[in-house]
Amino acid sequence: MGNKIARTTQVSATEYYLHDLPSSYNLVLKEVLGRGRFLKSIQCKHDEGLVVVKVYFKRGDSIDLREYERRLVKIKDVFLSLEHPHVWPFQFWQETDKAAYLVRQYFYSNLHDRLSTRPFLSLVEKKWLAFQLLLAVKQCHEKDICHGDIKCENVLLTSWNWLYLADFASFKPTYIPYDDPSDFSFFFDTRGQRLCYLAPERFYEHGGETQVAQDAPLKPSMDIFAVGCVIAELFLEGQPLFELAQLLAYRRGQHDPSQHLEKIPDPGIRKMILHMIQLEPEARLSAEDYLQNYVGVVFPNYFSPFLHTLYCCWNPLPSDMRVATCQGIFQEILKKMMENKSGDEIGVDSPVTSNPMNASTVQETFANHKLNSSKDLIRNTVNSKDEIFYSISDALKKNRHPFLKKITMDDLGTLMSLYDSRSDTYGTPFLPVEGNMRCEGMVLIASMLCSCIRNIKLPHLRREAILLLRSCSLYIDDDDRLQRVLPYVVALLSDPTAIVRCAAMETLCDILPLVRDFPPSDAKIFPEYIFPMLSMLPEDTEESVRICYASNIAKLALTAYGFLIHSFQLSDVGVLNELNSQQISTTPASETPSHLQKANGNAQLQQLRKTIAEVVQELVMGPKQTPNVRRALLQDIGELCFFFGQRQSNDFLLPILPAFLNDRDEQLRSVFFEKIVYVCFFVGQRSVEEYLLPYIDQALSDQTEAVIVNALECLSTLCKSSFLRKRALLQMIECVYPLLCYPSQWVRRAVVTFIAASSECLGAVDSYAFIAPVIRSYLSRLPASIASEEGLLSCLKPPVTREVVYRIFEKTRNPEFMAKQRKMWYSSSPQSKDWESVDLFDKDAGELNSVECRAEQKQSVEGKKQIKSASKQPEVQGKYAEKDAKLRIPRNPRPNASNTVELRDPVYPEKLQFSGFMAPYVSGANSFIEPENIPLYSFSMDKRAATNPPVASESSLQMNSLGMGSLSVPWMDSMSKSFNLASSVPVPKLISGSFHVGTNPKQFYRVVHEPESRENDQISSAISKFQDLGVSSSSKSASVTSEDASSPADLVGEPSLSRTSVPDSGWKPRGVLVAHLQEHRSAVNDIATSSDHSFFVSASDDSTVKVWDSRKLEKDISFRSRLTYHLEGSRGMCTTMLRNSTQVVVGASDGVIHMFSIDHISRGLGNVVEKYSGIVDIKKKDVKEGALVSLLNYTADSLSGPMVMYSTQNCGIHLWDTRSDLDAWTLKANPEEGYVSSLVTSPCGNWFVSGSSRGVLTLWDLRFRVPVNSWQYPIICPIEKMCLCFLPPSVSVSTTMKPLIYVAAGCNEVSLWNAEGGSCHQVLRVANYENETDVSEFQWKLPSNKVNPKPNHRQNMSSKYRIEELNEPPPRLPGIRSLLPLPGGDLLTGGTDLKIRRWDYSSPERSYCICGPSLKGVGNDDFYELKTNTGVQFVQETKRRPLATKLTAKAVLAAAATDTAGCHRDSVQSLASVKLNQRLLISSSRDGAIKVWK
């Protein structure tokens, strides 16, 4: 094919290249490739992609091309049988009258182009390409095919470094003349540079001894020589081994290429190349022999068969599947590459003992993958992603830069020694990385991942690809990290998916600190490349991305700082800023290179700090700042201080700190005071005392215990480091000491730690001079050493309520009061201070008793006098100095009422003196509910014990407080470790946290306490001991006798009466309409109020949740909602607000729980304006069990986090810990009982009751998560609503300690049930309505069985599956739809009769209708009568004048339409209350109206 033509006519017009080609090929010329003279190469567009067309133009005599076509057919057919080919023959050819066309697929890159393209090939990549080139030649020679023109242009490469050998030259001459270079230039010189890859034996001389035919067959040794030339050029960075003249000289023995090959550092590669280019063809080995002989010398062992087989399996897969499979076997790839390294590679610390993964294992893995779908494969591999990174976590930790690790308290000393506040720069060495982490084979995996990452369709697989790149970056060199991996990671910072952007950010911040060295061209990578690409992240629409940026900004800043320092080191050795000697000699001393460099370095550092400061300010104070972003930024505030230095930390960081505290998020405030200690160490002593200590002082009166504790721990750290001056330290002690009586043990321990640290800092003399007088009133006795935490804890008096503590704080803010108090502290004698509180207690006794109008008032006063007289005895005074104080109890106490002393201590302002508000005989007790007053204490005491305290008794009781001040009694030894009970002493009963010792069955005492949010690990053992004594730890406020408390089953507990959750006792709404809110377009199903009653939210069927400002209810005439949250088309079924937060949880009809936070700035002191800035979406949880039916707050104890209990349409009951996405537990109700329509939980969190849509009520024990009791409501109807019953204190404990609940079901009736036995106590009902049933028809007293003993199978199936309901669904009975419990057992109800009623528990006849329509001619002449039937009390509302007919729904609606008092005009769906200047009632109805009453 053209071997006999000397030259052809030059074709100049490219439009004629495809003129003779049939139009069926659909080819469009794109550009001309190369400078070939024999074949013209052009790039064309085809319907299926780009192709390369090589055109041969016929000139002169006609030539028969059929022989060459036969050779092309043979080559194509032979290579079709290859399983994993490295050869790429021509795919199509066409001969016309004027030309011949050869067509193959276009490849973006060949070896010649790749050698000059960044990122440049690494050593292992070059070996991998050489390995594949030998494999390609081996495949050809095994099929008896020789290429004939192997050169860099004919070696094609994919983006993942898979090699193909193309453009087989079966139509080119085998031999060419030695003395005529024209043939060489015509056939083989495509670049015009006269580079020669032909074997020497392919040149012949005219007239020589041996005559050869130009078309003689090619030999394999000729291809081996060309392969050697290509491999040499590969390792010589693109420099050719031979030009034509050099090759001819080498043929004559006049040229030695070994000198040129000395530039290759690997001797094994040089040896292999020299062996391939020998002059003697017979001395050259076959391609297979070279592959076998140089394994372990040139080619790593894992190349074949492991890595090659792996690539063969990856080639046919799409990008998503490649990443998924790579992730699944990444560990095996790493192990295999780390084994048996070749050459001088450094091994790992210990050999890998696991079995190696061979080629068969790889093939089996991919074969199994092919059996599954792509989605299953991706799912299985993605689930194991954590296994990849656990194995390298230690490596990441070892190789992190020293100043990039988290700064701990122990590191502060070392960090401050590293930190030089004077120079403020250039003080840290650059990033060291250990060499044992090197694994050069990881570059190949990284290249494959980079080639796939742009084509991955699934976002989570793009994320996994980035994380795999992060893993590979641990084992590759710096150049590959910067040139190969980093550009792809940075490009994905603008990915449309948030999780991909977060992963790219994390990977970027993990890769950059690993860099040890970089070229001068990358010295400004941060200011010119990294920071501009990150500039949009502070305004990212997704909060998770901003959080990720904030959590990594400190690491990024310190890494940029390290890069800057390293660039200065490069300039020191003359790499950067080179100046010639003449310029230096003529430059003044002030402008020498060292001075210029230092000035330039300071300018660059200041610019870097300015850039980071702008980012921090945008994250903290920008328009898209959130509490979560701020919290993330605070986690590394110490590293930021280190980066900014002392001056800029004062100038920049200090002014933005108030922005953190202005946020209402309690978690943010807690983290702020946890991390503020790092700022203290960097800004200096003066800044701490002037700016930061006021913040800490403010935190001490915070509502959140974690904030208080973190502030105290910060102070303790500063004291232990001697960072505070004496004056500032004493001021903080005066601010802190009231917290010694705080009800939380966690806070008290933190206060004790601070006081002990302060004492150690001041010394013994100053401690007793300044600290002891301040804290003496809070201690039962003074410890031997104030610097001892254990001693202080053992001497602490019991805690008081939060209300008392906050009043003390208000007093301490008064300068006059503090001046008076200091005079008392430092002027009084020790004796007067010891008993000052006792005198004050006695002084207020009469006032306290006057408040409590009880029959036993006289006895109580006498008891106090006895206590006072006993306290005056010297023996009693000496008792406080004893270490082991014991409670003396007579062996046979007299059972008369005069021995009972009841101490009631409400809060009075005159008792809020530091020296007097804690009486020695007043102690706290374990508690679970909020009180309204100081704890109430009662104890039985024999007069002989009071008058003769030193007398020992066999009935002495030693009680251990077990670390809980609330469990201690002043007489009892706080350091005792066990109970020592004499056999004659009655077992003490702990009722609501108080101890009662006595035998009189009529002696009972009631104690209400403040909950302890933090208790130590010994609480559980204490509770278990009390339970062994027959005492319930969950008991609540109640009056208890020895009879009533004899049964442990009675001590179930009474609900908490929190000030914020339950209306005031005795509150009686008058029915005066305050506001009418009509923004909702459909039914308002539920209302929830905030903890501080500043706002409330409403959930509606119109797919919205609206936020209303409570403070404007009584002020604004036109009242509008402040914020609106949209539920994306689903109905809002139920809602609740998490306690002590602004977070709202809403259950929707599509089964999604929406959780969001309200950005609300409440009105405080000064000129603070109340503001609702927006809604922050926190999370959405799809339960996938149908609509949400019920939703309520759940609090097991004060230690648990915010939890929500909810029920679903598919009979599921779940407890969700809102801090995670998972349920804490899940229970399943019986489907045959219907779905769970209502829930009610106990305040202690030990039990709850569920009501179903078919009238089945079930009591569940949450300790074991099993149903305890289940009973059927008297009629089969849905349980509409349930709530707890708060009985009055006068009721006996046998009743109050049982789980009592109000149940709204049936037709206009509410019943009070004891869930323990399923018995009914009381029924509240409304008469004169249709569908009502006579009372006598129901068996209210005894619970109904759900299933008959031996039912008929057919009837059972019908009853179980309610088949009749499919044909005719039962109508929903009119009745009560909303309940609001009140203290004392009272109840507010609202229902379909459009009325809201108040039912009085103690005096049922005083019940009344708050609001509702009045029937024409009848008026409100309702009265309430009591009946009894089968032992159940019935309270029934009836008309004084009987109605002729029973009321119908139409009659009620007609009356509502004409009512002028503003009553509801549709069913009342929800009730709630808020406490402002007065208590207000909020009600919502099915027509979308919300009404506020007073």
UniProtKB/Swiss-Prot annotation:
WD repeat ranges per the UniProt record: 1079-1118, 1127-1166, 1184-1226, 1231-1270, 1276-1323, 1371-1409, 1466-1494
CDD domains linked: STKc_Vps15
Catalytic activity: L-seryl-[protein] + ATP = O-phospho-L-seryl-[protein] + ADP + H(+); L-threonyl-[protein] + ATP = O-phospho-L-threonyl-[protein] + ADP + H(+)
Role according to the record: Serine/threonine-protein kinase required for cytoplasm to vacuole transport (Cvt) and autophagy as a part of the autophagy-specific VPS34 PI3-kinase complex I. Required for pollen development and germination, probably via the modulation of phosphatidylinositol 3-phosphate (PI3P) formation and vacuolar organization.
Pfam family of the protein (one): Pkinase
Tissue specificity statement from the Swiss-Prot or TrEMBL entry: Mainly expressed in anthers, pollen grains and pollen tubes, and, to a lower extent, in other tissues and organs including seedlings, roots, stems, leaves, flowers, pitils and siliques.
GO BP terms in the entry: late endosome to vacuole transport; macroautophagy; pollen development; pollen germination; protein transport
InterPro entries linked to this entry: ARM-like (IPR011989), ARM-type_fold (IPR016024), HEAT_type_2 (IPR021133), Kinase-like_dom_sf (IPR011009), Prot_kinase_dom (IPR000719), Ser/Thr_kinase_AS (IPR008271), Vps15-like (IPR045162), VPS15-like_hel (IPR055231)
Post-translational modification: Autophosphorylated.
Localisation per UniProt entry: Cytoplasm; Golgi apparatus, trans-Golgi network membrane; Endosome membrane
Gene behind the chain: VPS15
Deleted gene: phenotype: Reduced male gametophyte transmission. Abnormal pollen grains with unusual large vacuoles. Reduced pollen germination rescued by phosphatidylinositol 3-phosphate (PI3P) treatment.
Protein name, as recorded: Serine/threonine-protein kinase VPS15
Lipidation (N-myristoyl glycine): G2
Domain Protein kinase: 27-307
Residue numbers spanned by region Disordered: 859-903, 1037-1064
Gene3D superfamilies: Leucine-rich Repeat Variant, Transferase(Phosphotransferase) domain 1, YVTN repeat-like/Quinoprotein amine dehydrogenase
Family label: Belongs to the protein kinase superfamily. Ser/Thr protein kinase family.
